[in-house]
Curated annotation (Swiss-Prot):
Positions with biased composition (Basic residues): 103-112
InterPro entries in the cross-refs: DEAD-box_helicase_OB_fold, DEAD/DEAH_box_helicase_dom, DNA/RNA_helicase_DEAH_CS, HA2_WH, Helicase-assoc_dom, Helicase_ATP-bd, Helicase_C-like, P-loop_NTPase
Gene that this polypeptide is encoded by: DHX38
Binding sites annotated in the UniProt record for ATP: G555, E556, T557, G558, S559, G560, K561, T562
Source organism per UniProt: Bos taurus (Bovine)
Disulfide bonds: none
Catalysis performed (reactions): ATP + H2O = ADP + phosphate + H(+)
Protein name as annotated: Pre-mRNA-splicing factor ATP-dependent RNA helicase PRP16
Record bears the keyword Aminoacyl-tRNA synthetase: no
Subcellular location: Nucleus
Length: 1227
């Protein structure tokens, strides 16, 4: 290259002097002092001590020794080396002539390099370039061959070539220095030696740095010049490929510009640089390719030459060091080639800390836990196998691992449930749908779109900020405007909660009901009674009743069965020997019928005629006719097995087949067998009377003919997708048509009823001059004063529209109803064995239900029934009768009740329709788990207490255990909160705000404790409705919780159970919850995912749970229920300890102890099983003995003496005929 005057050190990256300054970029200024210093070779001086002679002597000895060894063995060498050796021989003369002319080199005059032009680009001809490439290809095709050529000759020849190379290298360095100066001074001459073989020192100038490389050549530099500031002990390998040294001129020009900088940043070699398939241009500064010798090149050009032996030796050492560096490099970096090697310690330390933080962030908590678990498992396996021994014990145990409890799971089944005893005759579960793919079934599953839309709007309206209200704002506070609290009706004057106020009907039923229909207005009560179909067959009916203990009475709806039968029996003298009881499936029905009968008899409600429902007993000592729900009669049978207070019992609306009705059938059948004086009358509206008759032993069936008024039934032409919308349209059409008479709409549930009522009112408001309509909803949760409204007469000129559940199907006689709109759906309680709970779901009604509903329209005049489903759906998609409740609900409470009534063998109990085997076994297993049944299936003392609570058995158990643990006050609140469906609501548009407020109540260990916290906060805020609305809590639900709590507290007081508080020690509360729900326990698996310990079923924390996202994931939890949505979500979760599970649920869990072997555990399990077998054998013997005793006694007649007179009966000391003939004796 030509000289150029500009300083080579200008704008160049310098290495950092570690001792003097901190790392950074340095721009040197132009000055004479900043010229790069060039070290000149010192003049050769002979050693004073003669060390140079000694060194040459040693070298000669080593060479002779090497010659001796090499003669003894042949060598395997490559074809390339053989070619090199031939070249070496050919070039031997060149070396001698070179050495001879070295002294006169200064006097020689070399031809100056020719300037490159586009027509004369320099370099060799294209023909030579092609020949060279051909030779290269041939050489690569050859393999490896054996050669015994003398190694010593080759070594000598090679070293001579290396001396030549080194000499030329030094010359070129000098030239490059001069050319650099000349370029800076403005000279534009190019070197004509571009295509000559380049020395190892010269090559790195072509290596691209990130600042200079093109996109193609990025990151391809390898080493730097040895004379740069970043000094490297290993030289960069030489690239002497003919392919590399003969580039097209444009590329060469580009490289010449880049190569003026002698110092390049060393870069790591990416892995792709080594590959065969990589682009050849990428070999710019990367891994060296195959070297083809150091002597004279094949094309005759001069190779590397060395001036002295020291230079040759130095060059060989450099090559060896380069190889060593290369193989010892880690990812292309080492201490010499690392551009950050000489950075300041402070910078390095900060960078390392930053990288360490990043590394910690990158690994997820889940991954870290998996790694730890794997490591522990591997260590454990190695220690167990005995391959290794632990030398050091880590005494600094992690806190969580020290406290971790491992549970072993057993599946213990008591002998009475292991299959040897059969409890039911119905093996398969019963599904309450005829065809799950039918239109009605699909629409029932989807629900109403109108209801969904209405719910969202209501929540949005409730949650929106009422900015127009001054109360609660700063301006309102200044003006003295305060928020008005809704008056709380359930609070008495002394501030206590009276939960019975909303459930009492007697106060609202005092007023005499006024007639609304023309029929009722024109006729007196006596005339109305005589008009009923039952009046025509009164005497026949009484005769059959007199002759038979059990009678089935079948009559269509409106025939007068419910109201007249009790009065006829009373008039016939049955009330002289005891009360006449009449059971109804629902509370409203019992209350309304009692009111009607009391009016017909001309007395006040609660005197001669009274009713008894849950929370309210409207009877007195003078009561002769008592209407009640079937649950009340069932409770009375607990206290008095033979029902001695009653002379006759009427089981009304038996076709409803409620759970309590079916149990009563079985019980009363036994009671009638024991009491020959008791009369049992079963009434039904449907024609399925043969089933009842055969159940009671082929008893007579009495039919009451005819219905009072005809009913016209109209079906829908097409299936209705949205039953609420269709019902609203139909009701408005009927109302606006102007025909007289009230409307009754049947809807599945409370929400549907409320939405339908609102929609009708909204649509009427949109119409001008629409006739007045009073919309009255009725469902079981409605306060009694509103329920009583439907029986009161509407103002003149106002039509009534009653929207009801199937509560209005039976016994509910509302005067004046002419139009019935039947949606075709109802809500049924169905047991889900998977979660072990009952759920209310919408299902299509049965044909029997449909007939009952249409019958409502013909009570007081001719009517119409609009069915919102097609005639084919009625025939093909509806079941004939409803599936009995006993076949679709949880039987735990029924089993408890039957056991408490003394029924030992459930297979012997007479069910009209036996419950499915799965349901029965599930219920009994659950009761055994909770300790209500012992190992033989007998009732325990805990079970006897559980019967008294109208709760799920698990909740009853929780209450009972809480008295022993001393936290009954807190558990009472939690149980009350769990018995109410939803406490919080999330309005659309304010979900995040709602969630944030909800989080304030969260107790991180338990959702149950969060509920407790909510109630206590509400109590501290004086049961405020405003507080509830501010915190997105249903105020109505909280009031319901307070009522349930008061009711349960009364039962606890009756049972003499202590009410105590544990204060702030809520761990006891968690343990108490664990005692009731240990069978629904789950253990941690991964992050946020749990699996049921017993079944292995995956369970996930619900996002609304207090434990979700709290950063606290306990190893063991128990949950209240499992809800299936997109995942299996647990609802109401509480963290528990592993020891609690083992202590409270020993039939499932035991703590894994290191000392105990598997054999010991197996032996213990065998002992437990044999102990249970002995108990079972003893129980079977006792049961056998009890049966034999019963067989010895006479099964006929009553055990006790009867006091009721019957025709033909003779008392001792009396004449054969009674003193007087009864007034109504005979036909």
């Amino acid at each position: 290259m030509e000289d150029s005057g500009e300083d080579a050190s200008l704008h160049r990256l310098e290495g950092t002097d570690v001792d003097s300054q901190v790392g950074g970029l340095i721009f040197k200024t132009k000055s004479a002092a900043s010229e790069q210093h060039v070290f000149k070779a010192p003049a050769p001086r002979p050693s004073l001590l003669g060390l140079d002679l000694l060194a040459s002597l040693k070298r000669k000895e080593r060479e002779e020794k090497d010659d001796g060894e090499d003669k003894k063995k042949s060598r395997i060498s490559s074809y390339k080396d053989w070619e090199e050796s031939k070249d070496d021989q050919r070039d031997a003369e060149a070396e001698d002539s070179d050495q001879a002319g070295r002294s006169g080199r200064k006097d020689r005059h070399y031809r100056s390099a020719r300037v490159e032009t586009p027509s004369h680009p320099g370099g060799v001809s294209e023909e030579f370039w092609e020949r060279s490439r051909q030779r290269e290809r041939e050489r690569r095709e050859h393999g490896v061959y054996a050669s015994s050529k003398d190694e010593k000759d080759r070594k000598k020849e090679r070293s001579r070539d290396r001396d030549c190379d080194r000499k030329r290298d030094r010359d070129e360095r000098d030239r490059s220095r001069h050319s650099g100066r000349s370029e800076r001074d403005g000279g534009s001459d190019r070197s004509s030696r571009r295509n000559e073989p380049e020395s190892p020192r010269h090559r790195p100038k072509d290596a691209a740095t990130p600042s200079r490389s093109t996109w193609e050549e990025e990151d391809s530099g390898y080493g730097s010049s040895r004379r740069s500031q970043w000094e490297s002990p290993s030289p960069t390998p030489s690239y002497r490929d003919s392919e590399r040294s003969h580039r097209p001129s444009s590329r060469d020009r580009d490289r010449s510009v880049r190569s003026r900088y002698s110092d390049d940043t060393p870069l790591p070699t990416p892995s792709y640089k080594y590959n065969e398939w990589a682009d050849d241009r990428r070999h710019l500064g990367s891994t060296p390719r195959l070297s083809r010798g150091r002597g004279r090149r094949e094309d005759g050009e001069e190779g590397i030459s060395f001036d002295t032996e020291e230079e040759r030796q130095q060059w060989e050492d450099d090559q060896r060091q380069a190889d060593r560096d290369w193989y010892m490099m880690d990812e292309g970096y080492d201490e010499f080639h690392n551009p950050l090697a000489y950075s300041s310690d402070d910078y390095v330390r900060r960078r390392e800390q930053h990288l360490h933080k990043q590394k910690q962030k990158r690994i997820s908590a889940q991954r870290r836990q998996i790694n730890e678990d794997n490591e522990r498992w591997e260590t454990n396996r190695m220690l167990t196998s005995g391959v290794v021994h632990r030398l050091e014990v880590d005494e600094d145990f992690e806190e969580d691992s020290a406290a971790k409890v491992h549970l072993m799971v057993h599946n213990l089944v008591p002998p009475f449930l292991d299959g040897r005893i059969v409890f039911t005759k119905q093996p398969e579960p019963v599904i309450p749908v005829k065809d799950a793919t039918s239109d009605l079934a699909i629409i029932a599953r989807k629900g109403s779109q109108t209801v969904r839309k209405h719910r969202e709007q209501k929540e949005r309206k409730k949650a929106q900020h009422k900015h127009w209200e001054l109360a609660g704002t700063k301006l309102g506070d200044i003006m003295g405007v305060k928020k008005e609290e809704e008056p709380d009706k359930s609070l008495t004057e002394d501030g206590k909660v009276d939960y019975r106020t909303e459930q009492k009907f007697a106060d609202h039923m005092k007023k005499k009901s006024e007639a609304s229909s023309e029929f009722a207005k024109k006729k007196s009560i006596l005339e109305q009674r005589q008009y009923l179909p039952i009046f025509a067959v009164q005497q026949e009916l009484l005769t059959i009743i007199r002759d038979n203990s059990i009678v089935i009475v079948v009559g269509e709806t409106g025939s007068g069965k419910t109201t007249q039968l009790t009065q006829y029996l009373h008039e016939d003298g049955y009330t002289d020997y005891g009360m006449i009881g009449c059971t109804q499936p629902r509370r409203v029905a019992a209350m309304s019928v009692a009111k009607r009968v009391s009016e017909e008899m001309g007395g006040n409600l609660g005197e001669e005629v009274g009713y008894a429902i849950r929370f309210e007993d409207c009877t007195s000592e003078s009561t002769l006719i008592k209407y009640m729900t079937d649950g009340i009669l069932l409770r009375e049978s607990l206290r008095e097995a033979d029902l001695d207070h009653y002379s006759a019992i009427i089981m009304d609306e038996a076709h409803e087949r409620s759970l309590n009705t079916d149990v009563l059938f079985g019980l009363l059948r036994e009671v009638v067998a024991r009491r020959s004086d008791l009369k049992l009358i079963v009434t039904s509206a449907t024609m399925d009377a043969e089933k009842f008759a055969s159940f009671f032993g082929n008893v007579p069936i009495f039919h009451i003919p005819g219905r009072t008024f005809p009913v016209d039934i109209l079906f829908s032409k097409t299936p209705q997708e949205d039953y609420v919308e269709a019902a609203v349209k139909q009701s408005l059409q009927v109302h606006l048509s102007g025909a007289p008479g009230d409307i009754l709409i049947f809807m599945p549930g409370q929400e549907d009823i409320e939405v339908t009522s609102d929609q009708i009112v909204e649509h009427l408001e949109e119409l001008e001059n629409a006739p007045a309509l009073a919309v009255l909803p009725i469902y079981s949760q409605l306060p009694s004063d509103l329920q009583a409204k439907i029986f009161q007469k509407a103002p003149d000129g106002v039509r009534k529209c009653i929207v009801a559940t199937n509560i209005a199907e039976t016994s509910l006689t509302v005067d004046g109803i002419m139009f019935v709109i039947d949606s075709g759906y109802c809500k049924l309680k169905v047991f889900n064995p998977r979660i072990g709970m009952d759920a209310l779901q919408i299902y299509p009604i049965s044909q029997a239900n449909a007939n009952q509903r249409s019958g409502r329209a013909g009570r007081t005049g001719p009517g119409q029934c609009f069915r919102l489903y097609t005639q084919s759906a009625y025939k093909n998609e509806l079941l004939t009768t409803t599936v009995p409740e006993i076949q679709r609900t949880n039987l735990a409470n029924v089993v408890l009740l039957l056991k408490s009534l003394g029924v030992q063998d459930l297979l012997q109990f007479h069910f009209m329709d036996p419950p499915p085997e799965d349901n029965m076994l599930n219920s009994m297993y659950q009761l055994w788990i909770l300790g209500a049944l012992d190992n033989t299936g007998g009732l325990t003392s805990t079970g006897r207490l559980m019967v008294e609570f109208p709760l799920d058995p698990a909740l009853s158990k929780m209450l009972i255990v809480s008295c022993d643990m001393g936290c009954s006050s807190e558990i009472l609140l939690i149980v009350s909160m769990l018995s109410v469906p939803a406490i919080f609501y999330r309005p659309k548009g304010r979900e995040e705000e709602s969630d944030q407020i909800r989080e304030k109540f969260a107790v991180p260990e338990s959702d149950h404790l969060s509920y407790l916290n909510v109630y206590l906060q509400w109590k501290n805020n004086n049961y405020s409705t405003i507080w509830c609305n501010d915190h997105f809590i249903h105020a109505k639900a909280m009031r319901k919780v307070r009522e349930v709590r008061a009711q349960l507290k009364d039962i606890m007081v009756q049972q003499r159970m202590s009410l105590a508080s544990c204060g702030t020690d809520w761990d006891i509360v968690r343990k108490c919850i664990c005692a009731a729900y240990f069978h629904q326990a789950a253990k941690l698996k991964g992050i946020g995912e749990y699996v049921n310990i017993r079944t292995g079923m995956p369970c996930h924390l619900h996002p609304t749970s207090s434990l979700f996202g709290m950063g606290y994931t306990p190893d063991y939890i128990v949950y209240h229920e499992l809800v299936m949505t997109t995942k299996e979500y647990m609802q109401c979760v509480t963290a528990v300890d592993g020891e609690w599970l083992a202590e409270l649920g020993p039939m499932f869990y035991s703590v894994k102890q290191a000392g105990k072997s598997r054999q010991e555990n197996r032996r213990r399990a065998k002992e437990e099983a044999s102990a249970m077998e002995e108990e079972m054998a003893l129980a079977e013997e006792q049961l056998r003995a009890r049966r034999q005793e019963q067989e010895k006694r006479s099964p006929l007649g009553s055990v006790r003496s009867t006091k009721i007179y019957t025709p033909g009966r003779k008392e001792q000391g009396e004449p054969m005929t009674p003193r007087r003939t009864p007034a109504r004796f005979g036909l």
